[in-house]
Amino acid sequence: MLLEEPQSALYSWIQRSNGAWREQVKIGDVILVVDLGGGTTDFSLIAVLEREGSLELHRVAVGDHILLGGDNMDLALAHVVRMKLEREGHTLDAWQLSALTHAARGAKEQLLSHGSDVDAVPIVVPSRGSKLIGGSLRTELTKAEVERVLVEGFFPVVDATARPTARARGALTQMGLPYAQDAGVTRHLAAFLSKQIGATEDLAGFRSAMPQGATFLHPTALLFNGGVLKSPVLEARIVEVLNAWLAKDGGPPARLLEGADLDLAVARGAAYYAYVRRGRGVRIRGGTAQSYYVGVESAMPAVPGMEPPVSALCVAPFGMEEGTEAPPTPQELALVVGEPVMFRFFGSSARRDDQPGTMLDRWERELTELPRLEATLASEGRPAGDLVPVRLRASVTEVGTLRLEAIANDGERWRVELDVRAPSA
């Protein structure tokens, strides 16, 4: 079972409040969860609506896992210190740079913690060789330097129209993770909120308070998570930038939710979610925003210049809850195994009554084709290209992935997965 960190942070906030969370939110609220950890930045949006006389939380959008976080900040501070040492005539090797990065992390935490009155922290870079102690390099990192590098570099004041920039990349690069090219967290946030402007439009029972002509989805409440945001300076900058966007767009300022646990929220929230899965507590709902279909080729004689017609078979209905599975489709289909094949997926926010097994031969503009998926399914001793009779069953995971299983008559299964989360930054 997987659970996204922002959602886990919100579960922790609910659990820690002992029921008082209802006093901090109201119908029509949109909660923005900003999770800034050591290696990633994540955004989520949760709407507050009324259902049968009670408040209900409904997740309406999830951002990508942006590889940008506290580690980037530590490297940036280490670069500042290295430049100071190089101006003094010192050159650092890779081992010393690694030690410097660790020292910069510790200095950052000291200088930016709540209630800290420290203005500078000494930095010691160990030497290598026989003079390990006497040959160490010494300098300091000041609070002013940390705030300048982190606040202006990672949380710049930008307009809501700002977008992450992408530099021209070299033709060859080392294999590695797809790190964010733009370090501006506020630019990533602006892009996320702009893409989600319609995220609450089809949410039954939600009363939006966004003004006419809004250019991005307006959060009304903020919840922070992650050790980086223990700094009041960084927290204040995010609130400042977001509320400036809201004011310019004609909306009220967002308020900060009280009672967040920035260190242990993910662990505690995950434990509380296990409690929720047993039918207790408060569940954050997150049904699919579309009905989903898979393409099925017609069996027909070959005709020169003519592709076989494709029908769309509904496998997951509109509003299907995450963490649940749909019943198997009644149709028996033939699955091609042992050779490269292509799955075609479609989504529809218009056809809300279709159920698993609904087959569409024509759909005009009601369906939108999603990214195609290529795969070679294991043949398990069968000849390549063999056709296996199967029925399909879909499920939606807790992290918004559509999982499609093809189940043979003897119980053998093949599985493919497609990310069907709402568009995000």
Predicted regions, residues:
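Structured core elements
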Residues: 1-3, 32-35, 40-47, 67, ...
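N-terminal phosphate-binding loop and flanking beta/alpha elements of the actin-like ATPase fold
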Residues: 1-32, 47-102, 106, 162, ...
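Short beta-alpha junctions and helix-cap segments that line functional grooves
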Residues: 19, 28-31, 44, 278-280, ...
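Short, well-ordered loop/turn elements at secondary-structure boundaries
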Residues: 26-28, 37, 93, 117, ...
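Phosphate/diphosphate-binding loops
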Residues: 28-38, 96, 272-286, 291-295
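Core structural elements
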Residues: 36-41, 103-117, 122-128, 185, ...
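Active-site core segments that coordinate phosphate-bearing ligands/cofactors
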Residues: 75-86, 109, 144-145, 151, ...
